[in-house]
């Protein structure tokens, strides 16, 4: 098996405090994405990200993955925002299958919850 999906970086963030002190959801998504890239211990991983998956939340952003990718230099990645209610495991399974098939090299998966 040439293409084997492996988890190479994790980002996690929890904010507490008054509403005025908390970051917008878009900034939180950016922070955890960058933290996961840094956690991989190879910033070059962003050059392999072919897809960015973000499950839809209760925010008004049209395509937060595109904004993150363009801001951080991996703008060729295909982005998707999935519908509310889609099982998160299905997204992970789909990404793994695409990697196994050689359709993509790496995926960034960002999920927020309140």
Model regions: which residues?
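Extreme N-terminal starter segment of soluble prokaryotic enzymes
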Residues: 2-6
């Amino acid at each position: 098996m040439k293409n084997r999906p492996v988890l190479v970086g994790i980002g996690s963030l929890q904010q507490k405090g008054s509403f005025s002190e908390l970051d917008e959801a878009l900034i939180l998504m950016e922070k955890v994405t960058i933290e996961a890239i840094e956690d991989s211990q190879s910033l070059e991983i962003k050059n392999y990200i072919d897809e960015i998956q973000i499950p839809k939340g209760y925010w008004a952003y049209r395509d937060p993955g595109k904004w993150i990718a363009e801001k951080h230099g991996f703008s060729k990645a295909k982005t998707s925002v999935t519908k509310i209610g889609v099982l998160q495991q299905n997204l992970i399974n789909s990404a793994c299958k695409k990697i196994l098939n050689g359709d993509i090299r790496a995926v960034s998966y960002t999920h927020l919850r309140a």
